[in-house]
Amino acid sequence: MIFRRQLSTLIPPKVASPATLHGAPNAKRMADVVSFYKALPQGAAPALPKTANPFKLYYRKYFHPKSGKASGAPLLHLILGIFLFGYISDYQFHLKHHKNGAH
């Protein structure tokens, strides 16, 4: 009798009983995750549509993740744009200065 009780502790309980399989909350959550990933589209992403918008073209050329061209060109364009804006505004203010007969 004592020997039989010692052996019963070595035998694992029924882990895969029907009551434990249907009642596990983790099984439901895992099924939700699997169904979510099954609903996602498969394969490569579709190609971007053609556009004539210069801002979209600039974005696709320099900033889009699939372009693969990391460079300092946008920073250089920003510096040149600020310089050009400053030069044009300075020139216009200088012309207004000559309009009043100064110099």
Swiss-Prot record:
GO cellular component: mitochondrial inner membrane; proton-transporting ATP synthase complex
InterPro entries: ATP_synth_F0_fsu_mt_fun (IPR019727)
Transit peptide: 1-6
Entry annotated with the keyword Methyltransferase: no
Transit peptide among keywords: yes
A Pfam family hit: F1F0-ATPsyn_F
Assembly, per entry: F-type ATP synthases have 2 components, the catalytic core F(1) and the membrane-embedded component F(0), linked together by a central stalk and a peripheral stalk. The central stalk, also called rotor shaft, is often seen as part of F(1). The peripheral stalk is seen as part of F(0). F(0) contains the membrane channel next to the rotor. F-type ATP synthases form dimers but each monomer functions independently in ATP generation.
Family: Belongs to the ATPase F chain family.
Protein name: ATP synthase subunit f, mitochondrial
Source organism of the structure: Yarrowia lipolytica (strain CLIB 122 / E 150)
